[in-house]
């Protein structure tokens, strides 16, 4: 009986409903939302970093990813505070191929400081040479390794 009561008490404590964040920023955001004045989170940090993951050769997904990167770079809250990396691996290598229509968009993103990184494991597995890829890109040993490292460094990860 003693164990039953102890177990019941423990379950009662653990079964409490989760509470929403109660940080001052979260409370202010909630109040602004209720009043219809919420305009997005405040970018109160000095610097932000994000890695976009691209592992698909679907043209719509590639365009969406490039558009998402452009939108982040154009966000007034993040101006001068944002570092962006695009990591392509698997079928995502299509974005960096010379025979694909993305060169101008990628050059514009690189001009804005975006790191364009291709997984070398993918190149080996698919037997793709650097000559087949745009000369403006960089190379990383492993695309997933890059994501793991960046996340551990505090970078946000986006996989459109």
Give the predicted meaning of each segment.
Residues 16-20:
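Sec/Tat signal peptide C-region and signal peptidase I cleavage site
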Residues 1-4:
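Positively charged n-region of N-terminal signal peptides that target proteins for export
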Residues 23-26, 97-160:
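A cross-taxonomic marker for long C-terminal extensions/tails that follow the last structured domain
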Residues 50-53, 85-88, 115-118, 159:
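Structural recognition of the beta-strand scaffold that forms the well-ordered cores
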Residues 56, 91-93, 123:
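Short, glycine/serine-rich, charged loops/turns that create anion-binding
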Residues 23-85:
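N-terminal secretory signal peptides
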Residues 7-14:
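Bacterial N-terminal signal peptides
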Residues 82-96:
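Acidic helix-start/capping segments at beta-turn-to-alpha-helix junctions
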């Amino acid at each position: 009986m003693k164990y039953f009561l102890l177990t019941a008490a423990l379950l009662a404590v653990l079964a409490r409903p989760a509470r929403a964040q109660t940080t001052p920023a979260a409370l202010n955001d909630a109040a602004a939302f209720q009043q219809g004045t919420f305009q997005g989170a405040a970018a109160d940090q000095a610097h932000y970093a994000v890695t976009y993951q691209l592992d698909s050769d679907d043209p719509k997904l590639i365009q969406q990813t490039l558009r998402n990167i452009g939108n982040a770079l154009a966000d007034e809250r993040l101006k001068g505070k944002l570092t962006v990396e695009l990591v392509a691996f698997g079928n995502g290598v299509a974005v960096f191929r010379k025979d694909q229509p993305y060169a101008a968009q990628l050059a514009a993103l690189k001009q804005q400081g975006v790191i364009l990184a291709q997984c070398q494991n993918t190149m080996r597995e698919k037997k793709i040479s650097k000559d087949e890829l745009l000369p403006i890109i960089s190379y990383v040993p492993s695309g997933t390794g890059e994501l793991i490292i960046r996340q551990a460094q505090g970078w946000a990860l986006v996989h459109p």
